[in-house]
Curated annotation (Swiss-Prot):
Keywords: Ribonucleoprotein, Ribosomal protein, RNA-binding, rRNA-binding. Residues 7-21 have a biased composition (Basic residues). GO terms for molecular function: small ribosomal subunit rRNA binding; structural constituent of ribosome. It comes from the Bacteria. Disulfide bonds: none annotated. GO terms for biological process: translation. InterPro entries: Ribosomal_bS20, Ribosomal_bS20_sf. Residues 1-21 are annotated as: Disordered. SUPFAM superfamilies: Ribosomal protein S20. GO terms for cellular component: cytosol; small ribosomal subunit. Transmembrane segments: none annotated. The keyword Membrane does not apply. This is Small ribosomal subunit protein bS20.
Amino acid sequence: MANSAQAKKRARQNVKARKHNASLRSMVRTYIKRTLSAIAGGDYAVATEAYKKAVPVIDRMADKGIIHKNKAARHKSRLNAQVKALAN
């Protein structure tokens, strides 16, 4: 348990940061799910639009360290491959 005032403050800040980071991670997952559901719908235009909205969010969270940069790259690559497969 935190004893010093500094340690208590850091504990409070960590709780706040954890909640904020969880919210941001949830947002990334939501954008990915929206893109996947658009792909499942089979409409190339809708899937492309969803992908274009998801990519900047994924990149921003990777830059902030919310998700690892390799994980962001993996998601973008797989989503892009699925969207391109709809074009054929």
